Amino acid sequence: MFCLYYFIFQVLRLVVTLLNTSNDAKTLSICCYDLSQFIQNHPSGRMIVLDLKAKGRIMSLMEHDNPEVRREALLCVQKLLLRAKYASYLQS
């Protein structure tokens, strides 16, 4: 079980690194989507993403030129700020 969590957190760090370094719209929207799914499905997902200091970058992407990046960033911020059950209700 430890090995599985270690792998998950390595992938999560990679996603946050891509989020901070990439300028490609498709990459940014996929990273926001992946982080929002992690926040929604992991019991401590919000706190882990906040500890990785990804919130500021995600919030800055809400002003991106690409509408898909803005949409995914907004959904991710909703899940960061709200509990998972309320965020999933707003998404549908």
Q: Where is each model-derived feature located?
A:
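Long amphipathic alpha-helical tracts in eukaryotic proteins
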Residues: 1-92
